[in-house]
């Protein structure tokens, strides 16, 4: 039996509500990122653009969790897609069963958010804690850092300033140990060496910190008119994995034997 939870249709959401557009953009940036991994030897510029995908998916997930009338169905759709996508994810990006795709993270984040919203028997505390415990036993794309990022954005959802502060603060922390991006498509980022300001700018140009490139898309209200069926928003994820497999076979020098070896 599904629990009763009043949807927050009048709940303030400070960011962009044009989620069909954001999901489409997220998929495009994720495809660029995965093409960089699968076909272009981890080309840095493509990985940079790929950092935009997770924040867009995270914000769309938050909007969906606030708006949904059926949280269990929302969670179930994500979990089903995650399970169905896993073999494709393994074949497209040469991962093993132990490395789970991003839809598992989004499903787990949904469980954490709905536990916070439910507020029954202290669920706002033990619900997220259980989700972190699951991450201790499962290797899921983006891991505990990704879950923390999504929860911070959820908690700051009602304030544009709060969203920006939570986003930038956590992105700076998350990216601090990743490599500094000093060139972009052959253009040297000379301002990173400016006296006095170079170190400050450099903090924002670590690879993972460059997720901040998604922030204007989240904060700027748009009205694209694009309407996407509920199932299609995340349903495009496995389709892009099929495309990656085909491209690897056609242009990446991969063979079927090599692609299915991930199941061994």
Regions found by a protein language model. Name each.
Residues 1-264:
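Alpha-helical transmembrane segments and their immediate juxtamembrane cytosolic regions
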